From Swiss-Prot:
Belongs to the CCZ1 family. The modification N-acetylalanine is found at residue 2. This is Vacuolar fusion protein CCZ1 homolog. One of its GO terms (cellular component) is lysosomal membrane. It comes from Mus musculus (Mouse). Disulfide bonds: none annotated. One of its GO terms (molecular function) is guanyl-nucleotide exchange factor activity. The gene is Ccz1.
Length: 480
């Protein structure tokens, strides 16, 4: 449990809290500088770069020693994390001999002592290993999505090219890590699916088939509405990381311009009176500009076998977004972009308003417009489906939760217990703040519920959770 806030009086007024922070992040390969005097060659990327050379070498050497030492006890899975009073180090070996290390400062509480001096207390137990190990794995997955594997860079241009790619990517990416708001959802890395009735789903399926037929170069398609996934032709693991990029980086960057010009179609004078709200989120900004650049980001998928490099076209109309992925060897011209815009724009606009209408009807019928009665997180390991009423809208910089961090920590602790047990189980915890926290693990699914009935007993809590399962998950089997 987290340390309780200071009591009333001067102590409380003078207590300052500092969240966890990234101290350093580096990538090294011990094979690249095996002899004395060559140690610097091992370091492929180091943040912050201002750190003196000898200190970088010393820190990497220490990590090597820790990995070697732990390998004695666990040859296949050496070091995962190292706990110290002030910080915690996380280790990941995503490819053979390539090590990524992330050092996170523990949260701090600073108090004033009676003689006016600042007393610093490090909250050593606050960070959850599983959460930050998952964040470190995400760093690699996101790099791989846009650059391919470390080995691919070595094949393309040796260590020099790998260093350039790492510098270019991580220099920007590390600024987007908001370690203070990482939690259980980072462990799951799941996908939020949009709830749809059968008819609307068939309309979307039919739209995708038509688009793939009209634009024959399209290899894979993904369809999202309201930042939630409806359809994807990609493998699950590739989609989960692309989904994270879209929902935490690309879409939030385009929200502001959208709000500014929401009420006017992009081109109202379409033939046949079809309105057209479509626009590119990646690629050309203005299709009428003959000088417009048709550059799209490239992504790498199926890196374990076929290793495909693709152009990523993200096109949006109102709240619907469609991703078209095209082989990177296919040249994309301004004419192609105009053709895509004229085919996809009007149809996607109509489809987006159909989905919106149907969604609002379903919302009225189910009465789901009201504040959710239960605060819960659900995750299905089989299809990566994730649902949370605890997390409010993610902003580009932070994921907002509607519950106290202490309760989020308990959820993480329950998840760690689930990981250690193979069989299905249920854990019920009464928090210091009188909330009840329930975790259920059943048949590859996990459900976490927070209840605020302070005077309830175990039997009543169990009944409430059953009620939640019946209303929210009526078609899902949870063991009692």
């Amino acid at each position: 449990m987290a340390a309780a806030a200071a009591g009333p009086g001067a102590w409380a007024a003078q207590e300052k809290q500092f969240p966890p922070a990234l101290l350093s992040f580096f990538i090294y390969n011990p094979r690249f500088g095996p002899r004395e005097g060559e140690e610097e060659n091992k370091i492929l990327f180091y943040h912050p770069n201002e750190v003196e050379k000898n200190e970088k070498i010393r820190n990497v050497g220490l990590c090597e020693a820790i990995v070697q030492f732990t390998r004695t006890f666990s040859p296949s899975k050496p070091a995962k994390s190292l706990h110290t009073q002030k910080n915690r180090q996380f280790f990941n070996e995503p490819e053979e001999n390539f090590w990524m290390v992330m050092v996170v400062r523990n949260p701090i509480i600073e108090k004033q002592s009676k003689d006016g001096k600042a007393v610093v207390e490090y909250q050593e137990e606050e960070l959850l290993d599983k959460v930050y190990s998952s964040v470190l794995q995400q760093c690699y997955s996101m790099y791989k999505l846009f650059n391919g594997t470390f080995l691919k860079a070595m094949e393309d241009g040796g260590v020099k090219l790998l260093k350039e790619r790492l510098e270019k990517f991580f220099h920007r990416y590390l600024q987007t890590l908001h370690l203070q708001s990482c939690d259980l959802l980072d462990i799951f890395g799941g996908i939020s699916f949009f709830p749809l009735d059968k008819m609307t789903y068939l309309k979307i399926q039919s739209f995708i088939n038509r688009m793939e037929e009209s634009l024959s170069v399209v290899k894979y398609t993904a369809f999202l509405y309201n930042d939630q996934l409806i359809w994807s032709g990609l493998e699950q693991d590739d989609m989960r990381i692309l989904y994270k990029y879209l929902t935490t980086s690309l879409f939030p960057r385009h929200i502001e311009p959208e709000l500014a010009g929401r009420d006017s179609p992009v081109r109202a004078e379409m033939p046949g009176n079809l309105q057209h709200y479509g626009r590119f989120l990646t690629g050309p900004l203005n299709l009428n500009d003959p000088e417009a650049k048709c550059r799209f980001p490239k992504i790498f998928v199926n890196t374990d076998d076929t290793y495909e490099e693709l152009h990523l076209i993200v096109y949006k109309a109102m709240s619907a977004a469609v991703c078209f992925m095209i082989d990177a060897s296919t040249p994309l011209t301004l004419d192609f972009c105009r053709r895509l815009d004229s085919i996809v724009g009007p149809q996607l606009t109509v489809l987006a308003s159909d989905i919106c209408e149907q969604f609002n009807i379903n919302k009225r019928i189910s009465g789901s417009e009201k504040e959710p009665q239960f605060k819960f997180i659900y995750f299905n390991h089989m299809n990566l489906a994730e649902k949370s009423t605890i997390h409010m809208r993610k902003t580009p910089s932070v994921s907002l939760t509607s519950v106290h961090p202490d309760l989020m920590k308990i959820l993480g602790d329950i998840n760690s217990d689930f990981t250690r047990a193979d069989e299905d189980e249920e854990i019920i915890v009464k928090a210091m703040s009188d909330y009840w926290v329930v975790g259920k693990k059943s048949d590859q699914r996990e459900l976490y519920v927070i209840l605020s009935q302070k005077n309830a007993n175990l039997i009543e809590v169990n009944e409430e959770v059953k009620k939640l399962c019946a209303t929210q998950f009526n078609n899902i089997f949870f063991l009692d």
